[in-house]
Amino acid sequence: MTDDPAKPVGPDADRLPPWLARQLQNLLEQRGHALLLAGPSGLGQDDLALALARAWLCERPTAAGACGQCTSCHAVDVRTHADLLVLLPEQLALELDWPLDERTRDKIEKKEIKASKWIRVEAARPVVAFGPPTRSRGATQVVMVYPAERLTIDSAITRL
């Protein structure tokens, strides 16, 4: 615990560097339907985006973010939350231990395709079907595209 009332307190605030914990709190206070987190590489936009997704999907959120204890928080942590769709280039997904769809994983393992540095159109297509009728747990669904500049033109058009 801290004596500083300006410092956010909570599981996500403890996971993030102080400058990102403050941004998380600001973003939670001004929730919109879409956000673009941009900045130089290495500042933690991906960590901030995931903490924000956790807070939005949390069953018992606090003012500082996700509770870190509920089933939903656990599902985000182990990368299995049905209401979180993360679009990553295959190469980055493998590096960060994010699951790939079974078909793509099999093709990469059989060396039929190389893991891409780009977000392919095949990966973006599920976003079209990912919507209110497919909600699993609550009223919120989150699509996280990281890094957005790795969308191919075709996958960006599919996403729209």
Go through each PLM region and give its residues.
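Clamp-loader machinery-focused feature within the broader ASCE/P-loop NTPase space
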Residues: 2-154
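Surface-exposed alpha-helical interface segments used for non-catalytic interactions
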Residues: 157-158
